[in-house]
Design a protein with these regions (language model features):
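Bacterial N-terminal signal peptides that target proteins for export
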Residues: 1-8
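Bacterial N-terminal signal peptides
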Residues: 8-18
Length: 157
């Protein structure tokens, strides 16, 4: 009787642990890539799920990058926030310096820059301001010195 109770308790514990673990979460080293599609090393089915690398969180849908990816510096500060859709950059793309200041901010659509583009000096002032339309610079671009003073304006053709 006691052996049966111990077995039932052990089995219940094992089942509860497996119910709360996420089988879709893996490490990047567990993936392989074939023609821009990601697979688990032992699978022929394109991978869908979350990949964890330290604090970084990367998401895949049908073997392609998908969703908001956030990566971190070793000090815990955010390194980048980028958005993917169907394996292409799509949405906000923000890069930060190790100290937490924004370095670059732009928007992508279907893998091409499409919208505003801001490059910042390390003191937080603008270094470059401009815009893209489907990967091509458009409109007025402004360039600034390290103190944030406007030094040049160029019209993109």
């Amino acid at each position: 009787k006691l052996k049966n109770k111990i077995f039932i308790i052990a089995l219940s514990l094992l089942l509860s642990i497996s119910a709360f673990s996420n089988p879709d979460e893996v490490r990047k080293k567990d993936l392989r890539i074939v023609e821009k599609i990601y697979y688990l090393k032992d699978s022929e089915v394109p991978f869908t799920g979350k990949v964890s690398e330290g604090r970084d969180r990367l998401y895949y849908l049908n073997g392609k990058q998908d969703g908001k990816w956030i990566s971190f510096y070793k000090n815990g500060n955010i390194k980048s926030i980028v958005t993917w859709k169907n394996g292409k950059l799509n949405g906000k793309y923000i890069i930060y310096e190790n100290n937490g200041r924004k370095s670059t901010e732009t928007i992508y659509k279907d893998g091409k820059e499409n919208g505003y583009y801001y490059l910042y000096n390390s003191n937080g002032t603008y270094r470059t301001k401009g815009a893209y339309s489907m990967g091509k610079p458009v409109g007025e671009w402004e360039y600034y010195d390290k103190d944030g003073k406007l030094t040049n304006k160029v019209i993109a053709e």
